[in-house]
């Protein structure tokens, strides 16, 4: 669903044709975040900022889909609990209405210092292994800070809707639980399962860990909505919602964003295998910039996921509107979603400037590089997720040189960049034949708009 369709649909939902009578409010409203990766009091402020936004939205509950802590320390959970207490003292709204915690754990809560150089980072910041959650009774710490027992499977009901979760160390238990208790769930309305990892072969992009458990538990249950985190993939990517035998939704990250595989400006972990580190990486873990979350509103006939850019305090992207009952319509099955999504286009008169320079790659090594500069492909709220650069020899054969993500692929509409730069080694260019460079703007499903082309060039 593109933004124009969403606005029309929202207007139809919001008021009846006769007399403009406002539609009833949602039955349920839930704030959703994941992967806060709290290290210290400063990083906990981002979580608190999201909580304040959720409070102002009047949510009934707040869902945290795991990786509350980054290094897996007791202090991180304490900072999170203190932030919650400042915003929702006594688990209540200012008007006294109860706000339900829907929290679970992720891999970093159990083993955060095992990744990359996080142990060194933790020690350098004045924290100690002596406060690792796993060495201080993680179950007891959960009850201490979040006020509930640490159980393998947790079920709560909010405004008549069921929410079920499993902790990181029990992420394989849901299939057995559904076999035993699934019949107790009301199949006339949606229910929600959330875990840190995403269901395999749904919204995952090479990073999951679910091992097919959620598919076994929920396939053939169209009223199930499964929400996961872990991948840090942006909510501007349409692959972060999927519909098949159930509905799966990614919760993105409140710490940093990651790119899918295949981009020259991704960090090395996600870049193409044949890339040579010519382009600087877009901000990722080590820069921890854009923080994303959602507000989910449940109505009788739809679920609306409003996406938020908490860094820039603005709407992130077009909301997802899931019709109910989900069995009758699956607009977010990948094929249907791709077909309905508009393709981006460059502004009229856009040009690409191409030049060769002697520069340096990420390792600081001298490199002869092709540099392309061109305007962002933005028209209204339709914008490019990435750009594909192709070499087009005069003989007619085409070769994909590289794909680069938009520098603001994970930011709100209001903060879309004006210009894009692509950099790659001249070793990717044909030698001794005339060629042109073509730049295609693409949406998140890889569907491309009309290209802009450079003047004819020749490599010696």
Stretches found by the model and what they are:
Residues 4-22:
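N-terminal export signals
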Residues 32-34, 62-67, 100-107, 192-196, ...:
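Active-site neighborhood of phospho(di)ester-bond hydrolases with catalytic His/Asp-centered motifs
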Residues 186-203:
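Short acidic, glycine-rich surface-loop motifs adjacent to enzyme active sites
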Residues 429-446:
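Beta-strand-rich modules
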């Amino acid at each position: 669903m593109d933004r124009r369709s969403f606005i029309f649909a929202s207007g139809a939902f919001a008021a009846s044709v006769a007399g403009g009578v406002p539609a009833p409010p949602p039955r349920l409203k839930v704030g959703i975040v994941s992967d806060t990766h709290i290290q210290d009091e400063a990083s906990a402020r981002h979580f608190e900022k999201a909580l304040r936004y959720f409070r102002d939205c009047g949510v009934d509950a707040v869902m945290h889909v795991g990786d509350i802590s980054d290094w897996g320390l007791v202090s991180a959970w304490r900072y999170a609990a203190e932030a919650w207490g400042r915003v929702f003292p006594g688990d209540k709204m200012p008007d006294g209405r109860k706000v339900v915690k829907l929290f679970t754990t992720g891999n970093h809560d159990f083993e955060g210092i095992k990744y990359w150089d996080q142990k060194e980072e933790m020690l350098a910041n004045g924290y100690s292994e002596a406060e690792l959650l796993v060495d201080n009774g993680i179950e007891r710490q959960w009850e201490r800070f979040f006020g509930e027992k640490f159980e393998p499977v947790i079920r709560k009901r909010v405004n008549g809707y069921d929410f079920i979760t499993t902790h990181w160390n029990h992420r394989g238990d849901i299939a057995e639980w559904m076999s035993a208790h699934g019949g107790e769930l009301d199949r006339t309305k949606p229910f929600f399962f959330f875990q840190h990892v995403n269901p395999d072969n749904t919204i995952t992009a090479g990073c999951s860990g679910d091992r097919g458990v959620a598919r076994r538990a929920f396939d053939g249950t169209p009223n199930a909505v499964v929400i996961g985190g872990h991948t840090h993939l942006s909510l501007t990517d349409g692959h972060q919602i999927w519909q098949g035998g159930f509905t799966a939704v990614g919760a993105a990250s409140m710490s940093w964003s990651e790119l899918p595989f295949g981009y020259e400006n991704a960090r090395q972990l996600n870049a193409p295998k044949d890339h040579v580190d010519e382009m600087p990486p877009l901000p990722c873990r080590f820069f921890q910039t854009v923080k994303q979350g959602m507000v989910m509103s449940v109505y009788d006939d739809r679920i609306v996921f409003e996406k938020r850019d908490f860094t820039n305090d603005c709407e992130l992207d077009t909301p997802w509107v899931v019709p109910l009952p989900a069995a009758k319509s699956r607009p977010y099955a990948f094929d249907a979603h791709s077909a309905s999504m508009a393709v981006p286009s460059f502004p009229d008169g856009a040009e690409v400037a191409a030049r060769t320079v002697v520069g340096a790659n990420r390792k600081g090594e001298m490199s002869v590089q092709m540099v392309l500069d061109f305007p962002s492909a933005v028209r209204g709220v339709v914008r490019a997720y990435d750009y594909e650069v192709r070499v087009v020899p005069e003989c007619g054969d085409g070769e994909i040189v590289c794909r680069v993500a938009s520098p603001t692929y994970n930011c709100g509409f209001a903060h879309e960049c004006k210009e894009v730069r692509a950099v790659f080694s001249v070793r990717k260019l044909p030698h001794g034949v005339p060629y042109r460079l073509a730049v295609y703007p693409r949406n998140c499903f890889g569907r491309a708009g009309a290209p802009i082309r450079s003047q004819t060039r020749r490599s010696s």
